[in-house]
């Protein structure tokens, strides 16, 4: 009995010693280099303005691409050209704002967003060759620009620049509203105010949009060729995120 107890004590001591030297790290084979932690990127006002430039440039490039402008009918071609000119002019104004806020102007399309959905838009437009897709795409892109500025308002630190972001967003929203009317004219999307009978419009009332102003959800647009027994491609276009900010 004593021998057994001694063996148990000795065994327990060995186990305790082994347990104390167990490596609880993740097992791996070979040498692994030490990884440097990612640096914290600062989303400065200049970075937001540079990103806005990249979005404006991207939209101008998409609308002026032959896959879009080349299939537009005569009326839409004039409209699209005017929108391209507006985005190009905006680049000049944004460039001055970037410089004033200590940044370097960025006159290139947003590469991350082009990979995410811009290239798909051009590919689908080239495959579909539908003139009827030009104005809906224009409306979607203008809505994207408006949502981008609205999102950036909350991130802008300079109060004067924040007000300018609001103005830029309002201008983009007006262009989106014009494009929407070109796609489907009328007042179907407006909320009307009526008398108690529910049919007579209230005198002096002003029609308003029923939904909340400036949604920030992804903008959707249907593009591409017709597919037998299947819906056409639906492209989701979202505003810039932290990995698509031009720092």
Role assignments for model-derived ranges:
Residues 7, 21-247:
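All-alpha RGS (Regulator of G-protein Signaling) helical domain and cognate RGS-like helical scaffolds
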Residues 1-20:
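N-terminal export signals
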């Amino acid at each position: 009995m004593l021998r057994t107890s001694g063996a148990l004590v000795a065994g327990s001591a060995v186990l305790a010693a082994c347990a104390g030297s167990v490596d609880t790290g993740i097992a791996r084979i070979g040498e692994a280099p030490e990884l440097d932690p990612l640096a914290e990127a600062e989303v400065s006002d200049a970075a937001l303005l540079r990103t806005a430039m990249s979005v404006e440039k991207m939209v101008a490039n998409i609308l002026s691409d032959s896959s879009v402008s080349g299939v537009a009918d005569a009326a839409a071609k004039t409209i699209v050209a005017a929108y391209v000119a507006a985005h190009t002019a905006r680049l000049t104004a944004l460039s001055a704002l970037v410089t004033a806020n200590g940044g370097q102007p960025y006159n290139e399309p947003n590469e991350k967003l082009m990979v995410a959905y811009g290239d798909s838009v051009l590919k689908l437009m080239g495959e579909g060759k539908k003139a009827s897709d030009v104005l809906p795409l224009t409306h979607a892109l203008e809505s994207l620009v408006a949502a981008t500025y609205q999102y950036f308002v909350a991130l802008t630190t300079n109060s004067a620049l924040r007000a300018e972001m609001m103005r830029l967003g309002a201008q983009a929203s007006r262009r989106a509203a014009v494009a929407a009317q070109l796609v489907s004219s009328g007042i179907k999307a407006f909320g009307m105010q009526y008398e108690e009978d529910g049919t007579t419009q209230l005198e002096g009332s002003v029609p308003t949009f029923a939904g909340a102003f400036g949604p920030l959800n992804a903008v959707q647009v249907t593009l591409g060729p017709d597919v037998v027994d299947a819906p056409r491609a639906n492209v989701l276009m979202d505003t810039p995120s932290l990995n698509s900010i031009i720092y």
